[in-house]
């Protein structure tokens, strides 16, 4: 590594490279929320942050950029537009493979030794790795070789990093914005009759069919499913309403309405549903989730009720059991909130993890360069 990896004068320069559409100058601009995922909390006298910017584009160029992104698995055009900020940094942070693959390519194409360090976080790539063509796997592994530190959101994904890429990965625990969802402590959980059950999300790994099969036409429950995805309803059920929620206010209103939040999932390894799970815990709601995706890294089974995958009966009876035991469910909700606080599952906590990892990367790079200098001498 060159001098960028061993910078000691002035603050460490970090470039936060996120996907097109979340430029902090534009994202929820009127609300002054900062950077999506809370990376801005890492800013200090010792660390300055720059962010990827959304360059204006017409319909034709937007179509081309999105097409290439879908074909290649990363947004080369967006990264190239931000190349100056990327290459001027000491360290680059990325949130998903869609950003780090293109950033890695840019670094590989840059001549010389004076290059930024790359923190590469994998989310979806490992779940689809075995389905990729041999050519893509070879190219992606080559690009992964440019990453100085690999991170994942779960131990499940970290295990796949070792299995598929023979590298170690550090788990960074995702966090929620306490401005959007302040902690609501409860004195006593009092369920409605019928029990109000809600599920929300647009993730491709949500299992809406199991959710509907669990609660439709059961008079013990009234259910709401909030998603922008098209959901087929096999039968007419007057106790299940399917409709999206638009905006943060409607989202909060859904949580206020519900007694229990359900996070139904298909098999995955990347903590699908973690955002909803965190929001529900902050809102003081009982949570039932499919026991997949590494969610147990975040909450124990004493805090969140986990059920088997594709099992509507288990889901239905688990929710019913919570409703039948208000005191036990109250204790479960309190325990979940305690675990969230102890693990600091907030955007501030998420940013702090990145600060610690960055200093670790710089120390390692400095040590490696010292050894290289001694060898050359």
Regions found by a protein language model. Name each.
Residues 249, 263-278, 291-292, 296-297:
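Nucleotide-sugar-dependent
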Residues 202, 301-313, 320-327:
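Conserved acidic donor-binding segment of nucleotide-sugar-dependent glycosyltransferases
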Residues 261, 282, 286-289:
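Short hydrophobic beta-strand element within catalytic cores of glycosyltransferases
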């Amino acid at each position: 590594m060159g001098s960028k990896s061993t910078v000691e004068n002035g603050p460490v320069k970090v470039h936060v490279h996120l996907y097109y559409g979340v430029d902090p100058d534009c994202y929820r601009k009127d609300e002054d929320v900062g950077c999506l995922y809370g990376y801005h909390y890492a800013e200090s006298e010792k660390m300055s942050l720059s962010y990827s910017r959304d360059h204006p584009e017409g319909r034709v160029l937007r179509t081309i950029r999105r097409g290439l992104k879908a074909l290649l698995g990363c947004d080369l055009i967006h990264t190239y537009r931000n190349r100056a900020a990327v290459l001027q940094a000491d360290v680059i942070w990325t949130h998903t493979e869609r950003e780090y693959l293109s950033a890695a390519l840019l670094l590989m194409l840059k001549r010389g030794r004076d290059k930024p360090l790359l923190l590469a976080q994998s989310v979806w790539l490992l779940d689809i790795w075995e389905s990729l063509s041999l050519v893509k796997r070879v190219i992606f592994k080559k690009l992964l070789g440019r990453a100085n530190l690999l991170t994942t959101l779960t131990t499940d994904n970290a295990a796949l990093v070792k299995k598929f890429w023979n590298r170690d990965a550090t788990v960074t625990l995702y966090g929620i914005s306490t401005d959007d969802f302040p902690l609501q402590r409860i004195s006593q959980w009092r369920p409605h009759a019928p029990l109000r059950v809600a599920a929300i999300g647009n993730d491709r790994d949500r299992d809406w069919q199991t959710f509907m099969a669990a609660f439709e036409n059961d008079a013990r429950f009234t259910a709401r499913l909030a998603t922008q995805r098209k959901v087929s309803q096999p039968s007419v059920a007057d106790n299940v309403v399917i409709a999206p929620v638009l905006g943060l206010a409607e989202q909060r209103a859904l949580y206020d309405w519900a007694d229990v939040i359900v996070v139904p999932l298909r098999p995955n390894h990347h903590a699908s549903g973690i955002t909803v799970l965190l929001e529900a815990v902050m809102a003081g709601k009982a949570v039932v989730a499919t026991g997949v995706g590494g969610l147990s890294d975040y909450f124990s089974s004493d805090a969140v009720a986990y059920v088997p995958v594709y099992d509507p009966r288990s889901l239905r009876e688990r929710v019913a059991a919570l409703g039948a035991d208000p005191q036990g469910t109250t204790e479960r909700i309190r325990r979940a909130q305690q675990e969230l606080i102890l693990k600091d599952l907030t955007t501030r906590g998420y940013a702090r993890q990145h600060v610690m990892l960055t200093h670790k990367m710089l120390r390692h790079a400095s040590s490696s360069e010292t050894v290289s200098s001694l060898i050359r001498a």
